[in-house]
Structure formats: C-alpha cells, structure tokens
Amino acid sequence: MKNKSKLLACCLMALPISSFSIGNNNLIGVGVSAGNSIYQVKKKTAVEPFLMLDLSFGNFYMRGAAGLSELGYQHVFTPSFSTSLFLSPFDGAPIKRKDLKPGYDSIQDRKTQVAVGLGLDYDLSDLFNLPNTNISLEMKKGRRGFNSDITLTRTFMLTDKLSISPSFGLSYYSAKYTNYYFGIKKAELNKTKLKSVYHPKKAYSGHIALNSHYAITDHIGMGLSFSWETYSKAIKKSPIVKRSGEISSALNFYYMF
C-alpha cells in the first residue's frame, strides 16, 4: 500500500542540518522510488519519479512527496516539543481496479481521502539523555476512517556531511478504514478470485527504515532510504492482498534555502 506521508517521512527524516548553511529552512527536490505492493497488482515492482517539498511560512508549512502530503500549522512549545494541526489531501491506501490482476479487477477503485490530522513531536535528547533521538505521533481522520502512526528515530552524524537515521514504528488503522481499503462487498464478487464477502476489523502494521543523507554543498544534498512494513492479519487475509509486507526504497536530490 503506497502511503505518501511515509514516503515523505523517509525522504525528509533527519536531514543533516549541521552540514548546511544556517537559515536553510525550506527544501525542494526530486527523486525516484521503487517498491512492491501488498495488493494483487499486475506490476511486480513499481518505479516512480516524484517531487518533494518542505516549505515553511512562519508557523505554517507545506510538505509533499509524490503530491501534497500535508498543509498545516506548527506550534513550538519548547525547543524539544512541538505540535501540528494539518490537512492531508491524499491520505489512504488507494488502488485502481485497472492495476489489479484479472480476477481481482471487479472491485471498485479505492480512493484517497482528505484527512484532518494532529501531530506531536518530541526530542528525547534531554529527557532520556538520548542525543539526536526523536519520537513522533501522528493521528489522521477522514470520511473513510482513522489511522495513526508512532515512530522513533535516531540520527548518527558519521561525518560533517553524512548522516544515517534508523527508525521503527507502529501504525493503527480503524475498522472503517481497513474495511474500505481491504474489504470486499457483495457487489464486487465474481466467479473466479473474489467469491466471498470480506469485512475486516481494525488493523495494525509495523515498519522499520534506514535513511541516509549527504550534503554535497551548503545548499544541495542527496538522500537514500530503505523501508520495510508488515501488516496484521486483518489486512493479510484480504482477498485483494497478495503479501503481508512490502519493501521500498527511494533516492532523492534536494536544494535547501
């Protein structure tokens, strides 16, 4: 399931800010991602180019990877803690019937949703004496359901220009969300692959990632990320799901100003 917010997080996570000129708060870039899908799709591996951005206007910000992922307002309470209220225009796990294998293409398209979200971000450096360690919580709700994610990230500066950032996290999907994207309705049944109705309940996933960033100049950098995500039984048992997990990678080049 392609999640633009998680792709954005992998691309922007733990940028080596110390390697860039002071005051570089905005970012634009291009990249390419490759990965498989848990859906019963025709393509074994999807390779797609994408644009990425992270722009701030005072407390307001705009972020995106492969589309506009977040448009929001961030409030910094302390140097270690901040919150954000945002709009996610393309949330969800969309899939088009034309992309599915024969026998699975009788379903209706699963579309994205416009979701309102709340984010919490805390730097654990002072609290637990964990340098360059961050925990983030994100909750989103739209007409097709609720989902949330909590991620722990630690950044290691290998040199003044190169950093790596391992992370791991858990995601939750409400029953309404899971049923819309992975359930099968009576009207979608056929005589080949989709022979019974499927109404899943709430679901979970776990994900790990490794991200690296290299500052080429004071303003130009590149990033490389790898991620793996595995899903709970409610999603794995869906007739339109092929595998329990998915692997993805992304390479990007960006300009900070």
UniProtKB/Swiss-Prot annotation:
GO cellular component terms, A-Z: cell outer membrane
Native source species: Pasteurella multocida (strain Pm70)
Pfam families recorded: MipA
InterPro entries tied to this protein: MipA (IPR010583)
Domain of life: Bacteria
Segments traversing the membrane: none
Compartments, record wording: Cell outer membrane
Signal peptide location: 1-21
Family per record: Belongs to the MipA/OmpV family.
Protein name: 24 kDa outer membrane protein
Keyword Membrane tagged: yes
Keywords attached to this entry: Cell outer membrane, Membrane, Signal
